[in-house]
A protein has these predicted regions:
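Hydrophobic, well-ordered secondary-structure elements that form the walls
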Residues: 379, 399, 450
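Generic beta-strand/beta-sheet core signal
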Residues: 331-333, 375-377, 402
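Active-site lining segments that contact anionic ligands and/or coordinate catalytic metals
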Residues: 325-327, 369, 377, 394-397
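Catalytic or ion-translocation cores adjacent to nucleophile or general acid/base/metal-coordination motifs
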Residues: 393-411
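Feature for exported/extracytoplasmic and membrane-associated proteins, marking the mature portion
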Residues: 2-365, 385, 407-484
Length: 484
């Protein structure tokens, strides 16, 4: 659990409840705390870098996203998922022949815990990301999930939770979304993206625009000092009382603007005025940045494509925004596919692939490919076993990291054996039932690797990722190695 500054919870609670200007009914687009007078940063950046979290809400099915392709492993996968004869599609298994165009060809083939060489392909709808992987601009981190400490199947089955603590509320959507984003279950107020941003605030002349969400509120972007500014795919959310007549009267608008400039003796009123002033200032800065010519790269028209297009436009305008470090959050829902997996999953993955590919191409166009890293996250993985028409809540999952600074065309981590059995055989020790992967890489390690690339010093990591001190060494390295 994060230890919060004693003065922040009350202020943060007030700011989060301040969604409307009471007199005007005008929504504030951000939860801006006193970012401008925040704690000293751990680093003062001289270049530009951005992290972009692509969150897949609902729990993505890992087995049909990064699909085992070598013949022995594929045959096990197909049998477990009720595939057809001769490696044909069936049940919730994909046909092996349909994976030929999206086979991943790393420089070095990954070897699983049993010493067997493995091969993977992406889902057939993910041709764009497969191309980026094979060109060296994307990597796969295998079997990531929340862990408090390194965990074996025997330790998972133990009743001694003092020695073998588990993440709370495993398999629960809301809690696992929160744990992925903040290391704490539902109700957490501080996320690791926001805590990374805390350390960069003083290097940004406009600190309020360090953390930006294009998909609504997310705890991932809330720091101890930094909080998120929210935009839509259409741009800045306007404070209409500052830019248009209120109740048809310019005089009322002028009066309201005058009121928020006044210093108040009542602390709550004073803080409210400061928040509103920053919201108006941030809106003005974002509008100016978005007035620049848009990137020529064509983005998909679907939701995720348009969210990432907005991120690309904001990155293009980073000098206008006055920022050198930024953390973004975008998302796509619909991945909780207990049924209709074969029918619905392809379109979702197609969105992810097309949007992330277009986004990478835009960073190349803007000359910032080496300075921007996008990565996937999700509530949890899912069962390898079929429930008849879909898969159920799981734990570990495979994730993609994309960008010019990514050491791509490679797999990181250890491939788990393809298994749903519950014997004492070595192949059966890497899941916790029904093929729910027991993570061999923690979210803390995944986040730490991204944070270090962003500029966070080793000594700052425990303040951002509370469990990172439980990991280290060859088996659970703090730096997973996928960033240059």
């Amino acid at each position: 659990m994060h230890l919060l500054h004693p003065h922040l919870p009350t202020r943060r609670a007030f700011l989060k409840r301040s969604g409307q200007l009471a007199m005007t009914g005008t929504a504030l687009p951000l939860v801006l705390n006193l970012a401008a007078i925040g704690e000293a940063a751990a680093f003062d950046a001289t270049d530009y870098k951005a992290l972009v979290c692509v969150f897949l809400y609902g729990g993505n099915d890992y087995a049909n996203t990064v699909v085992t392709y070598d013949n022995p492993s594929y045959n096990l996968y197909s049998t477990i998922r009720n595939g057809g004869a001769g490696q044909a599609a069936g049940g919730i298994a994909l046909a092996r022949a349909d994976l030929a165009a999206t086979v991943l060809n790393p420089a070095t083939a990954p070897v699983d815990v049993l010493g067997q060489s493995r091969q993977y392909a992406l889902h057939p709808s993910m041709g764009g990301l497969a191309g980026l992987f094979n060109a060296g601009h994307a990597a796969v981190q295998l079997n990531v999930g929340p862990l408090v400490v390194p965990m074996t199947r025997a330790q998972y089955s133990s009743t001694n939770r003092t020695l073998n603590p588990l993440p709370p509320q495993l398999f629960s959507h809301n809690d696992q979304q929160s744990i992925w984003q903040s290391s704490s279950p539902e109700g957490s107020t501080v996320g690791w993206g926001g805590n990374i941003a805390d350390l960069a605030l003083s290097g940004n002349s406009n600190a309020a625009l360090t953390c930006i969400s294009v998909t609504g509120n997310a705890v991932y972007l809330s720091g101890d000092t930094a909080l998120q500014y929210q935009v839509s795919t259409g741009g800045a959310i306007k404070i209409t009382s500052a830019t248009a007549p209120v109740y048809g009267s310019s005089a009322v608008s002028t009066a309201l603007n005058s009121l928020i400039q006044q210093t108040r003796t009542q602390k709550l009123e004073n803080e409210y005025n400061k928040v509103t002033q920053r919201a108006i200032s941030a809106e003005s800065s974002v509008t100016a940045a978005l007035a620049l010519p848009q990137p020529a790269t064509v983005f998909p028209a679907e939701s995720l494509g348009q969210q990432l297009k907005m991120v690309a436009r904001l990155i293009k305008g980073q000098a206008t925004l006055g920022v050198k470090r930024q953390v973004f959050f975008v998302s796509l829902g619909g991945f909780d596919l207990h049924d209709n997996l074969i029918a619905k999953h392809p379109a979702l993955l197609a969105q992810v692939s097309a949007a992330m590919t277009a986004f990478y191409n835009a960073t190349v166009e803007l000359g910032v490919a080496n300075k921007v890293t996008a990565f996937t996250a999700s509530d949890f993985g899912r069962t390898l076993a079929s429930n008849g028409d879909g898969s159920d809540h799981g734990w570990g999952s495979h994730h993609l990291v994309v960008g010019g600074a990514v050491k791509g065309n490679a797999f990181y981590g250890t491939p788990p054996p393809v298994s749903v059995a519950s014997t004492t055989a070595p192949a059966d020790q890497w899941h916790v039932g029904q093929g729910r992967l027991l993570p061999s890489t923690s979210v803390d390690q995944y986040a730490a690797t991204l944070a270090k690339w962003f500029g966070v010093a080793d000594g700052e990591l425990p303040g951002i990722l509370p469990n990172i001190t439980h990991f280290g060494g060859a088996g659970y390295p703090v730096n997973l190695g996928f960033m240059a």
